[in-house]
């Protein structure tokens, strides 16, 4: 999965997919009542990027729905996965459940079109704080209450705080999550980060009793760091330059082992090294 980083304006969906992304990451900020409000990152952000592009969250979902609904004039067949980077740091811990509830209602209405031929992409809810695991509970219970529990088949999870892998496993246990787990590891492109924790995550994925289905590394903009991440066995790379990742994947060293995921590739299924 080539994951376009910080895609917060509708116009950027086309831009990143046209550069080779089959997945995008979008920032979601919340108001003080835990409503998802904007797709917005803000300053500071990655080096070389404009930090302030934004849409209202529900407006963005409408654009995303069009980009992932077959038959729509804006449809991109290859855009198959969306990571919502949920900026829950502005919320109190006791608002996490509400945030999950409100997020589910927004997606149901504006992305899934109440289950009637809505967008088809798989969704990863990426949460920065292990203490906010109840966001997952709120999300799940709301879709059940709204009579669309089947949409949970399209939803996966990530805790993005680079926490100890054992602590992440405990948070999933509390949230009752037993699959659909992506594990991120990374840092802004302005700084360097080694691959030690990525290797631990890959080892968990490849073990017989691990909780991780997929591992992705962020934010990778250079060919050398792309090769290092692929050599470590990651499933996804988040980048500001999808064309760079696509170029490296077409090198002879990688064409035998990796290919770009399509809609038919289940993002919750584990492939071991």
UniProtKB/Swiss-Prot annotation:
Which body tissues produce this protein? Expressed by the venom gland.
Q: Which Cys pairs are S-S linked?
A: 45-51, 47-190
The UniProt entry's coiled-coil ranges are none
Enzyme Commission numbers on file: 4.6.1.-
One of this protein's Pfam families, by short name? GDPD_2
What biological processes does GO assign it?
A: killing of cells of another organism; lipid catabolic process
- Top-rank taxon of the source lineage equals Eukaryota
Binding of Mg(2+), residues? 25, 27, 85
Q: Which CDD domains match?
A: GDPD_like_SMaseD_PLD
Family recorded in the similarity comment: Belongs to the arthropod phospholipase D family. Class II subfamily.
Q: What is this protein called?
A: Dermonecrotic toxin LsaSicTox-alphaIB1ai
Organism of this sequence: Loxosceles sabina (Tucson recluse spider)
């Amino acid at each position: 999965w080539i994951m376009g980083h910080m895609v917060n304006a509708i116009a950027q969906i086309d831009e990143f997919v046209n550069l080779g992304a089959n997945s995008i990451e979008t920032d979601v900020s919340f108001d003080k009542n835990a409503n998802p409000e904007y797709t917005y990152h803000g300053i500071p952000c990655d080096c070389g990027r404009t930090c302030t592009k934004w849409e209202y969250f529900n407006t963005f979902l409408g654009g995303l729905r069009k980009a992932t609904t077959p038959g729509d004039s804006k449809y991109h067949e290859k855009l198959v996965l969306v990571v919502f980077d949920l900026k829950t740091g502005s919320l109190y811990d006791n608002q996490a459940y509400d945030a999950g509830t409100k997020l589910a209602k927004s997606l149901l209405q504006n992305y899934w079109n109440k289950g009637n031929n809505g967008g088809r992409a798989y969704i990863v809810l990426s949460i920065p704080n292990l203490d906010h695991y109840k966001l997952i509970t709120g999300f799940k219970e709301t879709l059940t209450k709204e009579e669309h529990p089947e949409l949970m088949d399209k939803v996966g999870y990530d805790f993005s705080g680079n926490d100890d892998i054992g602590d992440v496993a405990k948070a999933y246990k509390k949230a009752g999550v037993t699959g659909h787990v992506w594990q991120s590891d990374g840092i802004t492109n302005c700084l360097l980060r080694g691959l030690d924790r990525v290797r631990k995550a890959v080892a968990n994925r490849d073990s017989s009793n691990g909780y991780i289905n997929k591992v992705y590394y962020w934010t990778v903009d250079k060919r050398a760091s792309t090769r290092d991440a692929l050599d470590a066995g990651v499933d996804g790379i988040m980048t500001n330059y999808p064309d760079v990742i696509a170029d490296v994947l077409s090198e002879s060293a990688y064409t035998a082992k990796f290919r770009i995921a399509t809609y038919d590739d289940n993002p919750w299924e584990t492939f071991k090294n």
